[in-house]
Regions:
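Short glycine- and hydrophobic/aromatic-rich loop-to-beta-strand nucleating segment
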Residues: 1-2, 7-8
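Secondary-structure end/capping motifs
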Residues: 9-92
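Conserved C-terminal helix/tail region of periplasmic/extracytoplasmic solute-binding proteins
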Residues: 83-124
Length: 124
């Protein structure tokens, strides 16, 4: 999630609510018991067939971080691509724009573990 620092500081409650919903959705999608519902949703929303949805689902299982903390490497990759069109983006120090305090708060409070546990997934 990318938001201006001003928004994060003034409306952190909105950012926190969004991140909670994203984590709960991710936990739902990753739970084996919900696989058929997720496959159906992928087929409908991405307008793909069952094999394509299955491939996407398997990619999700393998590729997504269970605790989606911001990634410095990921941000640098995005920055590298964007600076081709907007060179000034290359001047930004990626490590200065990442702010994981709300994710840290959600993790420290046990929210992330509880969201996964509600879907039958243990992160321990």
């Amino acid at each position: 999630m990318v938001v201006p620092h001003v928004f994060l500081n003034q409306r952190g409650d909105i950012v926190e609510s969004y991140l909670k919903a994203e984590i709960e959705a991710l936990a739902f999608a990753l739970a084996p018991k919900n696989k058929s519902a997720v496959i159906k949703m992928l087929m409908k929303r991405l307008r793909t067939d069952a094999p394509g949805a299955e491939e996407g689902y398997q990619d999700l299982l393998k590729g997504v971080d269970r605790k989606p903390f911001p990634s410095l490497d990921g941000l640098r990759n995005v920055q590298r691509m964007l600076k081709m069109r907007t060179p000034k983006i290359g001047e930004i120090k990626a490590e200065e724009v990442i702010d994981a305090r709300i994710m840290r708060k959600l993790d420290d409070s046990g929210f992330i573990d509880r969201a996964y546990a509600a879907q039958g997934i243990s992160l321990k």
